[in-house]
Amino acid sequence: MALVPTPVVNEGPMFAEVDMGDNSSTPTVRATVVQASTIFYDTPATLDKAERLLAEAASYGAQLVVFPEAFIGGYPRGSTFGVSIGNRTAKGKEEFRKYHASAIDVPGPEVDRLAAMAGKYKVYLVMGVIERDGYTLYCTVLFFDSQGHYLGKHRKIMPTALERIIWGFGDGSTIPVYDTPLGKIGAAICWENRMPLLRTAMYAKGIEIYCAPTADSRDVWQASMTHIALEGGCFVLSANQFCRRKDYPPPPEYVFSGTEDLTPDSIVCAGGSVIISPSGAVLAGPNYEGEALISADLDLGEIARAKFDFDVVGHYARPEVLSLIVRDHAVSPVSFTSTSSKAESSPK
């Protein structure tokens, strides 16, 4: 493994860890997970930062680049949005207004720019965003191909804890796995990865490169990522932000509840981004040192070698005993009868 120095970004150290594949008999894919902080409440500046990071990854030959959960729009760590049981504050509502303003429409101009970036640097891009759909927000992952096309999205189906007051719930219509020249790529966000039925649905779609954007920097997260790699016989790419208090607006504009003693340099999210092989081997990371590009060459032959032992939806399945139904249609709270239906019911 080599450490490749890169320019300083936002006064933080940044480097790439590269694990070079040694098996030339099967295809390899160079993948990079980005560990960096959002520029909070400044979506245009965050997009500029994303492009700098994407360009840097591409310069090292990355073919697939994965960004953290909520990189565009921001993960509002430490905020309560003024909520307690039976009460909401005016300050919290204003905080939500600002957060809503930082989110992006899908499709929309920011999506167009991300697509153009993917095409410019010839990479497949997996980007964590906060999606705005009217006045409901979703924690979403967007997928782009190396030709600059937007492929689609995954909406987080189960926000965690207080996330549920600011994010809506995705439905079964956005659990995609894309068949690409690099392999079959999909994503689950943060603690969705602890949902065994969601994972099983993705395994059934043949996922080979399993992307796990997250906001969880605890050591125990690594155990989950290793388990998924072994269970699914897939590569796991987990990208997390590395944030200090100074990466968020200063108080009183932004307050970390219960941690008012933080200094500007206090670490509030320590990263831990990692790349793991289908055999459970750590290929790169976890990194807890600062902003970084963490890369590895993925030997796609490892997938078949792992599946020889364990194929969770194939030869190791028992569908006559255990099975799963996935309701993968879009769900809307309001349905309107069509014009044709109205015409059929009209008097002649």
Curated annotation (Swiss-Prot):
Catalytic activity: a nitrile + 2 H2O = a carboxylate + NH4(+); 3-cyano-L-alanine + 2 H2O = L-aspartate + NH4(+)
Enzyme class, UniProt record, top EC level: hydrolase
GO biological process: detoxification of nitrogen compound
GO molecular function annotation: cyanoalanine nitrilase activity; nitrilase activity; nitrile hydratase activity
Residue ranges occupied by any CN hydrolase domain in the UniProt entry: 29-300
Keywords: Hydrolase
Gene3D superfamilies: Carbon-nitrogen hydrolase
Protein task: Highly specific for beta-cyano-L-alanine (Ala(CN)). Low activity with 3-phenylpropionitrile (PPN). Not associated with auxin production but may be involved in cyanide detoxification.
Protein name: Bifunctional nitrilase/nitrile hydratase NIT4B
Organism: Nicotiana tabacum (Common tobacco)
Gene for this chain: NIT4B
